[in-house]
């Protein structure tokens, strides 16, 4: 029985990529005896989704750069690269990770709104496909390092188009109050004055209006803005050769709503943009990897507490994973489906599913309908392949979890979990003056 994409229930046991999830934790415990939770990813699904994305936008010849911030696990980067995608990095660390996993200079896109000298130097010295510059002054920094390295760096100016995606405020990036990008008029002036930066190939525009977008309307509005800017810049004698439409493609975390209409959206863009002769770039992240991962966690405790009103008692299910592992519910109010690995017989009833962190925000779901659960049972938090492990922390003195991959029926530990006893390894007592 299929539960979600890549998720099935075989013989009563939940499986990811055909791998029974109870087997995953049992295998991990041979390496990490105390493990009670871990991340699990289906690499075949990652590659299949990357291939599907590339095929959908093939009519435009889109150069797709996978957004490392979604999940930068080396095993995942290798599969994305195998599918023919490039890498989009938002920091020096992500640039280095992309280089380490074999992404060539022309396959690395540098993003971010707080450009550092180290990032600019890397782009000039090591080479990138392009840099998305967030403001005009950044061009001076990029020019300095490109001139010193004796190279030319291609640059796209990020434009804030004033488009509201009507999603969570923390993932809306294209409205007027967002911190990203320059006004369209500023970009037009900079493109016309590109001779000021002779070591830069300043012929691109970058628009990224938000994340977790299920209605393609805002993305198509951004594409219209990009086309209008390219046409106006050409009229001013400064034609553009690169249009980067960013990412933002959402996934249906509820399992009840519509999926992002990827192929239909791609077809509409191809029809409306085909006449614009430029190089196209997109930066998918979440859409590629979120459905391919789960957070697997043991049930530590189940408790019932009597109510103080007519509402009666409340059932709390305490997991071995917490908000330090999967921050999205606490940070964004995000809701993930939570499914028992082995469903016990009995009526489904509401439960508040929480973690062990000493915070009232450490709640995965307040009204999850779940069958009876007991201590030691396993549950899977679905669609956890993006913005999960990459955002985890050691808050509350908790070690980060191991990351396990399923690859064609083979199970591997791709990243070791942290032992709480070794979390002080970075602590020092070193005088910095005197």
How does the language model describe each region?
Residues 1-153, 197, 201, 235, ...:
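A charged N-terminal "starter" segment
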Residues 18, 40-47, 51, 70, ...:
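Electropositive phosphate-/nucleotide-binding environments in soluble metabolic enzymes
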Residues 61-65, 84-86, 105-109, 130, ...:
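Structural preference for beta-strand elements that scaffold enzyme active sites
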Residues 2, 145, 161-305, 370-373, ...:
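Active-site loop/helix belt of alpha/beta enzymes
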Residues 28, 268, 277-434:
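Charged (often Lys/Glu-rich) extended helix/loop segments that serve as interaction or gating elements
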Residues 59-60, 147-151, 236-237, 256-259, ...:
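Short, glycine- and charge-enriched coil/turn segments that flank and shape catalytic ligand pockets
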């Amino acid at each position: 029985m299929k539960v979600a994409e890549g998720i099935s229930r075989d013989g009563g046991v939940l499986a990811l990529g055909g791998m029974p999830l109870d087997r995953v934790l049992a295998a991990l415990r041979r390496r990490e005896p105390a493990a009670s939770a871990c991340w699990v990813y289906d690499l075949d699904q990652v590659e299949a989704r990357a291939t599907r994305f590339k095929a959908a936008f093939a009519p435009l010849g889109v150069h797709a750069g996978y957004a490392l911030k979604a999940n930068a696990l080396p095993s995942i980067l290798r599969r994305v690269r195998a599918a023919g995608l490039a890498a989009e990095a938002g920091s020096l660390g992500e640039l280095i990770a992309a280089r380490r996993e074999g992404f060539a200079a022309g396959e690395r896109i540098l993003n971010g709104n707080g450009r550092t000298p180290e990032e600019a130097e890397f782009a000039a010295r090591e080479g990138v496909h392009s840099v998305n510059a967030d403001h005009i002054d950044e061009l001076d920094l990029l020019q300095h390092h490109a001139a010193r390295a004796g190279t030319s760096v291609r640059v796209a100016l990020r434009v804030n188009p004033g488009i509201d995606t009507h999603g969570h405020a923390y993932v809306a990036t294209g409205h007027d109050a967002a911190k990203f990008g320059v006004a369209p008029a500023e970009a037009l002036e900079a493109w016309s004055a590109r001779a000021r930066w002779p070591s830069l190939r300043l012929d691109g525009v970058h628009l990224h209006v938000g994340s977790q977008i299920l209605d393609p309307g805002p993305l198509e509005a951004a594409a219209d803005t990009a086309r209008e800017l390219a046409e106006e810049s050409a009229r001013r004698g400064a034609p553009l050769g690169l249009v980067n439409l960013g990412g933002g493609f959402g996934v249906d975390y509820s399992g009840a709503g519509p999926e992002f209409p990827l192929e239909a959206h791609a077809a509409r863009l191809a029809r409306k943009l085909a006449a614009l002769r430029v190089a196209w770039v997109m930066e998918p992240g979440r859409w590629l990897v979120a459905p391919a991962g789960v957070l697997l966690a043991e049930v530590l405790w189940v408790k019932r507490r009597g109510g103080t009103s007519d509402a009666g008692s409340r059932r709390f299910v305490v997991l071995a994973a917490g908000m330090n592992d999967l921050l999205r519910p606490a940070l964004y109010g995000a809701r993930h489906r939570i499914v028992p690995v082995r469903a016990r017989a009995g009526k489904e009833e509401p439960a508040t599913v929480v973690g062990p962190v000493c915070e009232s925000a450490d709640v995965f779901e307040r009204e999850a309908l779940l069958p009876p659960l007991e201590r030691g049972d396993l549950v899977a938090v679905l669609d956890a392949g993006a913005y999960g492990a990459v955002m985890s922390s050691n808050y509350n003195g908790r070690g980060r979890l191991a990351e396990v991959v399923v690859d064609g029926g083979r199970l591997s530990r791709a990243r070791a979990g942290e032992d709480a006893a070794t979390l002080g390894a970075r602590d020092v007592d070193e005088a910095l003056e005197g």
